[in-house]
Amino acid sequence: MDANVLIMAGGTGGHVFPALACAREFQARGYKVHWLGTPRGIENELVPQAGLTLHLINVTGLRGKGRLSLLKAPFMLLKALMQARKVVRQVKPVCVVGFGGYVTGPGGLAAKLAGVPLIIHEQNAVAGTANRSLASFASRVCEAFPNTFAASSKRRTTGNPVRVELFLETPRQALTGRKARLLVLGGSLGAEPLNKLLPEALARLPQDIQPEVFHQSGKNHDAVTAERYRNVGVEAQVAPFIQNMAQAYSWADLVVCRAGALTISELAAAGLPSLLIPLPHAIDDHQSRNADYLAREGAAFVMPQATTGAAEMAARLKEVLMQPEQLNSMARTARSLAKPDATNTVVNVCVEVAHG
């Protein structure tokens, strides 16, 4: 098929990874994928690695900036819009698909001005600034979590595109007769509070329910985190980064982590119960809203960072680790919330809009 698609996503993995999953599906269907990003985001590494053509525009965020930056903002946005319009004219896409990040504002407006169908996808339970602005004139509005956007004939609840291997379910070994397995995902954003909390909390557990521990500490935090575990006499495997997340999820019985949009979707895909500690200063407190999606249904417990110390975490861990059937029930509920066809669904929406 001799047709181009322009994907817009930038900044963080939370925007870029779902977009990459959809890019691969577009390619599998014969489309040529172009990508609109910014010079500073993770897309500069990942998009060329995926063999996709990357176009860059110069735009940054405005929240929390000083007065001078705000005064310059209209000129920056106008320049970014002109750059985006040039890319749209050059690529001539059958549709433009935005997954969030600063790039999507100018890019989405450029699509509108060029008369190209615009589809947006929101990964979080609270829509980001750019997607909120674009929703009014987008042809379709895709959301990962129900009711992120107001009810509309344009709205589609698709779920988040996540790695396919998470859905290749490997039956977990029964908990009977073995230690439970705890996966801690400190990640790279806001990792240190979890890296401090978990060793202290686990040290408070009775020896007979101490779990096996695999702790992702985040880059440059592994040595200090491993030392914390040694100092309190808790055995743990600590790694700065887990390369094979599907394998780690398959190993685990319980996960302690933040509540980023992709993490929530991956927990559901893997069918894993979780204790969620939302990042307290996330924009619009979107991590708390993401966490509520699993917690409302009984697949997770939400533990606010401000009120969760070692004693509170130890008490919750003790409660769930002593009740294997509760863990099993939470796991089944998590799996029931997964959307394994999210990637196909998003691409189907785009193709429907592009070709009428």
From Swiss-Prot:
Family, similarity comment: Belongs to the glycosyltransferase 28 family. MurG subfamily.
CDD domains: GT28_MurG
UniProt keywords, alphabetically: Cell cycle, Cell division, Cell inner membrane, Cell membrane, Cell shape, Cell wall biogenesis/degradation, Glycosyltransferase, Membrane, Peptidoglycan synthesis, Transferase
Disulfide bonds: none
Gene Ontology CC: one annotated term: plasma membrane
Pathway(s) of this molecule: Cell wall biogenesis; peptidoglycan biosynthesis
Record protein name field: UDP-N-acetylglucosamine--N-acetylmuramyl-(pentapeptide) pyrophosphoryl-undecaprenol N-acetylglucosamine transferase
Subcellular localization: Cell inner membrane
Protein role: Cell wall formation. Catalyzes the transfer of a GlcNAc subunit on undecaprenyl-pyrophosphoryl-MurNAc-pentapeptide (lipid intermediate I) to form undecaprenyl-pyrophosphoryl-MurNAc-(pentapeptide)GlcNAc (lipid intermediate II).
Enzyme Commission number(s) from the entry: 2.4.1.227
Chief place of localization: membrane
Catalyzed reaction equations: di-trans,octa-cis-undecaprenyl diphospho-N-acetyl-alpha-D-muramoyl-L-alanyl-D-glutamyl-meso-2,6-diaminopimeloyl-D-alanyl-D-alanine + UDP-N-acetyl-alpha-D-glucosamine = di-trans,octa-cis-undecaprenyl diphospho-[N-acetyl-alpha-D-glucosaminyl-(1->4)]-N-acetyl-alpha-D-muramoyl-L-alanyl-D-glutamyl-meso-2,6-diaminopimeloyl-D-alanyl-D-alanine + UDP + H(+)
Topology of this chain in the membrane: Peripheral membrane protein
GO molecular function annotation: UDP-N-acetyl-D-glucosamine:N-acetylmuramoyl-L-alanyl-D-glutamyl-meso-2,6-diaminopimelyl-D-alanyl-D-alanine-diphosphoundecaprenol 4-beta-N-acetylglucosaminlytransferase activity; undecaprenyldiphospho-muramoylpentapeptide beta-N-acetylglucosaminyltransferase activity
GO biological process: carbohydrate metabolic process; cell division; cell wall organization; lipid glycosylation; peptidoglycan biosynthetic process; regulation of cell shape
Species of origin: Pseudomonas savastanoi pv. phaseolicola (strain 1448A / Race 6)
Binding site for UDP-N-acetyl-alpha-D-glucosamine: T12, G13, G14, N124, R163, S188, I242, Q287
Classification of source organism: Bacteria, Pseudomonadati, Pseudomonadota, Gammaproteobacteria, Pseudomonadales
Protein origin, superkingdom: Bacteria
